Amino acid sequence: TWAYTDDLPSVKLGETDYTKTKPNGRHGATNENVKRYIDFAAENGLDQVLVEGWNEGWEDWFGHSKDYVFDFVTPYPDFDVKMLNEYAKSKGVKLMMHHETSASVRNYERHMDKAYQFMVDNGYNAVKSGYVGNMIPRGEHHYGQWMNNHYLYAVTKAADYKICVNAHEAVRPTGLCRTYPNLIGNESARGTEYEAFGGSKPFHTT
């Protein structure tokens, strides 16, 4: 689980006090775990480590159609952003940011400047963005024009901050990366992760 605690059936950003909760012991994005992966990356010639589940809000992030799930700048108590980035730098490795939006695109756009500035302030130069779930606002779809406009907005905004974007659950590549080379990837194919929840048919190719 990405969640930090099982004590809360729901969370409210800005109101939930995680310092008064008991960690569930299954939260992977901890200082200890991340340092271990940084060490592994340094020893094996890998230059970047992606860490998902580092920020508050994962307790009920999926399936509840909540407009405001993440603020993209508030870490769980067991994830020290400054210390981990300094540790990674000392090993010749960088951390990659993760922004799961829970398909609440309006919320992401409201927080985007603050989120990107947080990355710059803490030494991040790349982000994996995610869009799991049914789009908010309702009626929009992952591959519709409204979302294509959003993907363009996110990439151009990231360019202002000199940040690279790897968009997950995004539209298939359209050539946008020729104009904005900071768009380094679109994870849009039905890949191996589907084996965790239903799998893919034998005739499916990616």
Predicted regions and their residues:
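Conserved structural scaffold segments of CAZyme catalytic domains across common CAZy folds
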Residues: 1-91, 99
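Aromatic- and carboxylate-enriched substrate-binding clefts and catalytic-loop regions
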Residues: 53-206
